[in-house]
């Protein structure tokens, strides 16, 4: 009898555990073809930087920020301290710079899924002080997540859900979404999360596993197939003239004629 009880328990555990799947795509069309007409109650969540858009200058690109943090860490600074130190400068650069859309089909996909009555929102590591510039950047590309009206209990002061964008104030994804899910009055049966970094996709998968939410994590690599924006030498020239951020083309011209000295 004990054997059969154990067997039944194991079978129940296996069938009741939410499914998890990780896929890699080159284009947003691959996401649409598989999930646009999914009847499940799901949330579709987009990362912001390098998924919805990327900085249009080497200096405003996320890779400059990441490489700068790495540089400080080689000097013995902790990752958190480097992030906190560089953030005000990164934010000032965002206010001066421009952005480039990754794929023109993304706004159309968002609108279609919203029109199906599904919840679609964005999730960024960005700090709360970056809310205004983030909203301006999204609006410039006609991207809106304001339809994502998710009733929740009071959120912790470290995170914010503003106009359909979850601001996590974190170096790595996961903790903010965990807090956000904790505050929800009802959870979805499935979460579809799109990010350009696989480690972020895996982190969100762990959050969903803890909540027993079915999960499809999508590693979105479209930006890798676009002409590169971040070029270290160009970023150095732009940093020299950062009081008024110049384009990559202007920086390349200065570099060619050695006028950056």
What are these language model-derived features?
Residues 20-29, 114-118, 127-261:
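C-terminal cap/substrate-recognition subdomain and adjoining C-terminal extension
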Residues 19-43, 48-167:
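Alpha-helical substrate-recognition element adjacent to the catalytic core
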Residues 4, 37-39, 186:
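Residue-level detector of transmembrane insertion/anchoring sites
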Residues 14-18:
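Sec/Tat signal peptide C-region and signal peptidase I cleavage site
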Residues 13, 58-62, 206-207:
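Single-residue recognition of alpha-helix boundary sites
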Residues 3-12:
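Sec-dependent N-terminal signal peptides
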Residues 8, 59-60, 227:
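A broad, structure-centric signal for solvent-exposed, well-ordered loop/edge residues
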């Amino acid at each position: 009898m004990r054997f059969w009880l154990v067997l039944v328990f194991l079978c129940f555990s296996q069938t009741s555990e939410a499914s998890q799947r990780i896929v890699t795509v080159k284009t947003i069309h691959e996401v649409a073809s598989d999930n646009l007409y999914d009847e499940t109650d799901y949330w579709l969540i987009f990362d912001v930087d390098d998924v919805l858009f990327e900085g249009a200058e080497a200096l405003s690109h996320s890779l400059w920020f990441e490489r700068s943090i790495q540089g400080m860490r080689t000097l013995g600074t902790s990752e958190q301290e480097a992030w906190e130190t560089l953030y005000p400068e990164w934010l000032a650069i965002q206010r001066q710079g421009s952005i480039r859309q990754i794929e023109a089909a993304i706004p159309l996909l968002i609108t279609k899924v919203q029109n199906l009555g599904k919840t679609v929102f964005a999730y960024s590591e960005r700090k709360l002080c970056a809310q205004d510039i983030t909203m301006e950047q999204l609006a410039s590309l006609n991207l809106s997540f304001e339809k994502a009206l998710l009733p929740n209990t009071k959120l912790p002061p470290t995170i914010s859900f503003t106009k359909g964008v979850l601001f996590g104030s974190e170096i790595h994804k996961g903790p903010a979404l965990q807090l956000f899910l904790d505050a929800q009055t009802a959870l979805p049966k499935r979460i579809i999360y799109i990010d350009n970094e696989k480690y972020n996709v895996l982190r969100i998968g762990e959050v969903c596993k803890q909540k027993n939410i079915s999960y499809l994590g999508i590693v979105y690599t479209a930006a890798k197939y676009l002409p590169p924006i971040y070029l270290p030498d160009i970023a150095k020239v732009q940093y020299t003239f950062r009081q008024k951020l110049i384009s990559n083309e202007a920086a390349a011209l200065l570099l060619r004629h050695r006028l950056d000295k």
